[in-house]
């Protein structure tokens, strides 16, 4: 998989993609992450990528020309399954969406900034708008990192223990069961006996029961 991220703050993302699972996925050759500084596609010597909105509205708007130039340059080199814009207006990001996007070969993620982007970009280039929650961030960079991480980590081969990824919260619209490690007893707090029994069927039954109970208590909306 290849993910191209377009941003006005590349330094905000570079460290993230050089750590942990994202770094491992790239070293294994399973994923490629390319970060593009939108200012490199600006027309003027000041590398200006924003301007005042028509109509006298407040704030600044990301200009159409640099975004067009960047996306067009990328599309000239390869086909993309989705061109994603991180936006509070978008569809709420969730695990099923991450699962679906993990099957893609090439993705572009455009990070929103300022008051937004010239709407013509959304009309003529963007194929999918994604929100990571009903709150406002300084820019779309954090959202892009969240999306990329959730998508890449479930590609086969990225995580050595694939069963661990498949049992994460939300994979079956259920929260994960509690997990424990050594010591089995600490300050009188005991690990559930069933987990120490070695009885695989009973452990699986306990895991499902715990997942259902936790989901009903903490996220009943997932069971609807």
From Swiss-Prot:
GO terms for molecular function: tRNA (guanine(37)-N1)-methyltransferase activity. The keyword Cytoplasm applies. Keywords: Cytoplasm, Methyltransferase, S-adenosyl-L-methionine, Transferase, tRNA processing. It catalyses: guanosine(37) in tRNA + S-adenosyl-L-methionine = N(1)-methylguanosine(37) in tRNA + S-adenosyl-L-homocysteine + H(+). Coiled coil: none annotated. Specifically methylates guanosine-37 in various tRNAs. Homodimer. This is tRNA (guanine-N(1)-)-methyltransferase. It comes from Phocaeicola vulgatus (strain ATCC 8482 / DSM 1447 / JCM 5826 / CCUG 4940 / NBRC 14291 / NCTC 11154) (Bacteroides vulgatus). The gene is trmD.
């Amino acid at each position: 998989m290849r993910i191209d991220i377009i941003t006005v703050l590349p330094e905000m993302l570079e460290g993230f993609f050089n750590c942990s699972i994202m770094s491992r996925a790239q070293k294994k050759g399973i994923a490629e992450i390319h970060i593009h500084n939108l200012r490199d596609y600006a027309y003027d010597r000041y590398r200006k990528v924003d301007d005042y909105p028509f109509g006298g509205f407040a704030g600044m708007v990301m200009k159409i020309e640099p975004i067009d130039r960047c996306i067009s340059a990328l599309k000239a080199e390869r086909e993309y399954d989705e061109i994603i814009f991180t936006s509070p207006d978008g569809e709420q990001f969730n695990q099923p969406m991450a699962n679906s996007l993990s099957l893609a070969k090439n993705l572009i993620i455009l990070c929103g900034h300022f008051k937004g982007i010239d709407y013509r970009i959304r009309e003529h280039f963007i194929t999918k708008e994604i929100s990571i929650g009903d709150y406002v961030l300084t820019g779309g960079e954090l959202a892009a990192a969240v999306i990329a991480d959730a998508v890449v980590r479930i590609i086969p081969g990225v995580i050595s223990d694939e069963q661990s990824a498949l049992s994460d919260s939300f994979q079956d619209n259920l929260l994960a069961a509690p997990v424990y490690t050594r010591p089995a007893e600490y300050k009188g707090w005991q690990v559930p006996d069933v987990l120490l029994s070695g009885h695989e069927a009973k452990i699986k039954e306990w895991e499902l029961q715990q997942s259902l109970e936790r989901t009903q208590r903490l996220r009943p909306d997932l069971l609807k």
